[in-house]
Amino acid sequence: MRHYETMFILKPTLVEEEIKSKIEFYKEVITKHNGVIETSLDMGMRNLAYEIKKHKRGYYYVMYFKAEPSMILELERLYRINEDVLRFIVIKYDSKKEVEAWHALVDRANKKPSHAKEKHEKTEHAHSHHTEEAGSKESHSE
């Protein structure tokens, strides 16, 4: 399975029930094709950078998931035929560095410290602890 991120923007004219229904529909598309949704972000109603189909606002939703590449074509097809989707994007994370970034984004979305941040904090803590010991040795030698 590969790592993906998708974001779609729904028309602002949809009522809350319709928005929830569309979100659930796309989640089911991923899971029915053996995909695993790691996390999702409901970004809500936002201003668009530019007018799209006579709309100045849109409802943004982001999902981070793992899936087989063959499923992506179906997901994109379903985005395209749905008139309520103003825009969408699917991003594939391929390289080791990209996959690490994907994990960091998922951790941040889940409000967990990222793997890279933990490594940095451990290194920083060890460095500051080493510096404190060196400083205390210097003060004893005077």
From Swiss-Prot:
What InterPro entries has UniProt attached to this entry?
Ribosomal_bS6, Ribosomal_bS6_CS, Ribosomal_bS6_sf, Ribosomal_S6_plastid/chlpt, Transl_elong_EF1B/ribsomal_bS6
Record Gene3D superfamilies: 3.30.70.60
Instruction: Spell out the residue ranges making up region: Disordered.
Output: 110-142
Q: Which HAMAP family match?
A: Ribosomal_bS6
Similarity comment: family membership? Belongs to the bacterial ribosomal protein bS6 family.
Q: Which NCBIfam families match?
A: S6
Q: What biological function has been recorded for the protein in this entry?
A: Binds together with bS18 to 16S ribosomal RNA.
According to UniProt, the name of this protein is Small ribosomal subunit protein bS6
What organism, scientifically named, is this protein from? Helicobacter acinonychis (strain Sheeba)
